[in-house]
Design a protein with these regions (language model features):
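NAD(P)+-binding Rossmann beta1-loop-alpha1 motif at the extreme N-terminus of oxidoreductases
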Residues: 32-79
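Internal alpha-helical scaffold of NAD(P)-dependent oxidoreductase catalytic cores
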Residues: 91, 158-164, 182-222, 227-232, ...
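Rossmann-fold NAD(P)-binding glycine/threonine-rich loop
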Residues: 132-165, 170-174, 178-180
């Protein structure tokens, strides 16, 4: 049975996201430039400008990438975009899909089915980093399906034809922000995907965000770092995560 959840007013939600990012020192003045990986900057679209979308998007902008944040109310993203500078822009979901080489899914999982239906043509062949987590109390039947079949495989079903890589789902935005480019060994971000080229791009973007990627395997193995999985929420180095992975084989 689907459970209705009353959302916060959208303006309040964006304001809360801005406060979170500003408090963590991520809203510094930004300028155009080559990405921190040394490769050419990419065009990235983000579906969902809430906590995860705005936080990870800010990391990529600081790394020199162009980012389009999208939502049903792109005009209400103006405060975020204005603060982030010339590498940031806002648009509709369709505009973001047309703009981007790579997409980040950062919306409640219950929305995936409708998004997949509305933009089926645009998703075909698109590299999509999936940061979603299925929450039973929020996401209804699709959340239940994802918990049973695995989020990675369920995302691949609803975003048919997209080149899915699971990434950035292992913790909340505040913890991601505080661990980005941390001193000492970089924090590991587990990733999983079936498409080698998409995994290669995800690896680069995880590093550009200030983390060290650890390839867990294909989409089916992304269960290991789904919410409730053994690798979920772990603030550990890549070396430690690889050590733990060996115990799951």
């Amino acid at each position: 049975m689907k459970i209705a959840v009353k959302p916060l007013p959208f303006r309040h939600y964006i304001f809360e996201c801005l406060l979170t990012i500003a408090g963590l020192g991520l809203l510094a003045p930004l300028a155009f430039g080559q990405s921190t990986s040394g490769a050419a900057a990419m065009k990235i679209g983000i579906i969902g400008a809430g906590n995860i979308g705005s936080t990870v998007g800010t990391m990529w902008i600081k790394a020199g990438h162009q980012v389009m944040f999208s939502s049903r109310h792109p005009e209400e993203l103006k405060p975020l975009v204005d603060r982030l500078g010339p590498l940031a822009r806002a648009g509709t979901v369709k505009q973001a899909l047309d703009f981007a080489e790579v997409m980040l899914m950062a919306v409640p999982y219950g929305a995936y089915g409708q998004i997949g239906r509305d933009y089926a043509k645009e998703f075909v062949g698109k590299i999509v980093l999936d940061a979603g987590n299925a929450v039973l109390a929020r996401d209804g039947e699709i959340g239940k399906e994802a918990r049973e079949a695995g989020v990675g495989l369920t995302t691949a079903k609803y975003l048919a034809g997209a080149r899915i890589v699971r990434a950035f789902n292992i913790m909340g935005a505040g913890r991601l922000a505080s661990n980005s480019h941390r001193p000492g060994e970089a924090m590991a971000i587990p990733i999983a995907g079936d498409d080698p080229e998409a995994v290669k791009i995800a690896t680069r973007l995880v590093r550009d965000a200030g983390f060290e990627p650890v390839l867990v395997g294909d989409l089916e193995r992304s269960r290991l770092f789904a919410q409730g999985g053994p690798l979920y929420g772990q603030e550990i180095s890549a070396k430690e995560m690889q050590k733990r992975l060996k115990t799951f084989k």
